Regions:
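Acidic, polar ligand-binding/catalytic clefts
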Residues: 2-64, 76-77, 141-143
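A ligand-binding cleft/hinge motif common to bilobed small-molecule-binding domains
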Residues: 14, 22-33, 114-145
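Periplasmic-binding protein-like
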Residues: 43-47, 131-169, 187-190
């Protein structure tokens, strides 16, 4: 395991610092980095989250004009046509950035941001740890994006996509992959 960041991961794969990266999507800025793709078998979705206030409903998420957005730096969001450039997001949306989904949810809860965007799986993990927050949050039924988690590998990685696929298939066949995905509130897609 090698630590990397959201923005550095492209360079790390290209420079051979890492061989593969789990829970990725080729749609998240990988077009200029050589890679192979292997389906992981899990799906997730990004949802909008705001404070649950009297009179506020799902229409609150229809328009972001004038609303303060708490976003994860380097992430690609559907509402912004997957443009992750901070300057673009600040200019076109009232966006502030952090490196913590917990922090972004707390900003919403403490009225320091109006909306954040998080994966449904992360939101459920957050609510597992903070059950009292569930009534305080309004979660959109509209998804920012739905994605199938994948593994991205360097073309000359010591572990080939075919070999990793065989290992994942063994986990899938034994039911272990489904159990692992469910532990993190991910939906098995196979």
């Amino acid at each position: 395991m090698v630590p990397t960041s959201v923005t550095r991961r492209y360079q790390d794969l290209a420079s051979k610092r890492i061989d593969l990266i789990f829970f990725e999507s080729p749609e998240w800025g990988w077009k200029n980095t050589a890679h192979e793709v292997l389906g992981l078998g899990g799906t997730d979705a990004e949802v909008y989250v705001a404070r649950n206030l009297p009179g506020r409903d799902q229409h609150y998420f229809d328009d972001f004009d004038g609303k303060r957005l708490a976003l994860y730096s380097g992430y690609h969001y559907g509402f912004a046509d997957f443009n992750s450039d901070r300057d673009y997001l600040r200019q076109h949306f009232k966006a502030e950035f952090s490196y913590s989904h917990d922090s972004n949810l707390l900003k919403v809860l403490h009225d320091r941001a109006d909306i954040t965007v998080v994966a449904e799986s992360f939101l459920q993990l957050f609510l597992d740890k903070n059950p009292g927050s569930a009534q305080q949050l309004l979660v959109s039924t509209r998804k920012d994006q739905v994605y199938h988690h994948q593994v991205l590998l360097r073309p000359e990685s010591p572990v080939s996509a075919k070999e990793l696929g065989r290992l994942l298939e063994r986990l899938r066949a034994s039911g272990e992959l489904k159990v692992l995905l469910q532990r993190y509130h991910l939906h098995a897609s196979h």
